[in-house]
């Protein structure tokens, strides 16, 4: 990695600010490898493996993988990991003109499931002096406030169909990336750079959880633990809203630059072309949950706006896409 000054960033990217640049390690003729490993007392294991070497005189290869197995600081009942990330990359590089330049083709695949992003909410009582008190024995940071069943029913805003959303897949992101990188310095001192990248993201999902005021209910309020209404619930509840974000991304970019030094002056001519297309939609739903670790989704009476009879029914999920 490297740091660009505001002036350099303005010239190369059009942004007047400090910018961080990243460089790919194409490798070397001798076989070289590196392994980093980390763990913590919650059971997280993380390793990063990279190796490279030469093929013949003017060819280099590089490959590597990043793996993260992070169960988080509390157990999620619907999955083993709060963050399960996998990244694989490989590349092939040709050295040009006895070291005057190179051309390299790189590929990267990433797959990340990170339900920990939406699992950090917690109920508590704020004392006022910076400290908090527990609610119903709930221990923030060590207990999960995500429903135990691991799935929701929602109405797809694109076609109106009732579907089931799985907590684990709802936070999934997958991507494929191909990059062509080249750099060559001519005998007259002129240097030419050309970099191009294409990225396709077939799955780019995210989840937002919202809440409301915590209140206490009795059997007379009509909340039950079963669909038949035979098991009334009494205790603390919180009305919750959930937004399910679904996306697909296609992007491409290339940058080319000619530069040459004339005495104390540097002349630079370049072109940047960037393309980004996002196919995005969001569906939302409401539900009422118990206030406890691994809360239960309660049944209550609600009306479906698409029902021509407008008859109230006992359901766990309601208020779709409102």
Predicted feature residues:
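Acidic/polar loop-and-plug regions of large Gram-negative outer-membrane beta-barrel proteins
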Residues: 80, 84, 89-97, 102-179, ...
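Glycine-rich, phosphate-binding/catalytic loops in enzymes
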Residues: 18-20, 211-212, 286-287
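Transmembrane beta-strands of outer-membrane beta-barrel proteins
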Residues: 31-35, 61-63, 101-105, 192-196, ...
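Transmembrane beta-strands of outer-membrane beta-barrel pores
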Residues: 5, 37-41, 67-71, 96, ...
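Outer-membrane beta-barrel translocator/receptor signature
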Residues: 4, 8-90, 94-101
């Amino acid at each position: 990695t490297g740091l660009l000054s505001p002036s350099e960033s303005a010239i190369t990217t059009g942004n007047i600010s400090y910018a961080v640049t990243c460089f790919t390690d194409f490798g070397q003729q001798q076989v070289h490898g590196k392994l980093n490993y980390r763990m913590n007392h919650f059971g997280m294991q993380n390793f990063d493996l990279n190796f490279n070497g030469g093929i013949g005189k003017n060819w280099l290869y590089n490959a590597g993988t990043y793996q993260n197995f992070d169960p988080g600081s509390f157990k999620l009942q619907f999955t083993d990991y709060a963050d399960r990330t996998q990244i694989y990359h490989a590349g092939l590089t040709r050295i040009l003109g006895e070291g005057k330049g190179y051309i390299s083709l790189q590929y990267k695949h990433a797959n990340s499931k990170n339900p920990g992003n939406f699992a950090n909410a917690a109920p508590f009582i704020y004392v006022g002096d910076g400290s908090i008190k527990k609610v119903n024995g709930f221990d923030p940071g060590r207990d999960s406030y995500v429903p135990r069943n691991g799935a929701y029913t929602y109405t797809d805003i694109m076609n109106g169909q009732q579907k089931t959303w799985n907590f684990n897949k709802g936070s999934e992101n997958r991507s494929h990336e191909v990059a062509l990188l080249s750099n060559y310095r001519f005998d007259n001192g002129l240097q030419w750079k050309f970099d191009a990248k294409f990225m396709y993201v077939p799955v780019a999902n995210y989840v937002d959880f919202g809440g409301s005021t915590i209140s206490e209910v009795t059997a007379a309020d009509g909340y039950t633990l079963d669909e038949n209404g035979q098991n009334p619930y009494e205790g603390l509840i919180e009305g919750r809203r959930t937004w399910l974000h679904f996306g697909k991304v296609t992007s491409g970019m290339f940058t080319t630059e000619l530069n040459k030094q004339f005495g104390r002056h540097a002349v630079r001519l370049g072109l940047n072309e960037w393309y980004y297309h996002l196919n995005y939609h969001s569906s939302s739903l409401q539900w009422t949950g118990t206030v406890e670790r691994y809360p239960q989704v309660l049944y209550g009476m609600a009306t479906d706006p698409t029902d021509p009879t407008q008859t109230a029914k006992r359901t766990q999920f309601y208020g779709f896409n409102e």
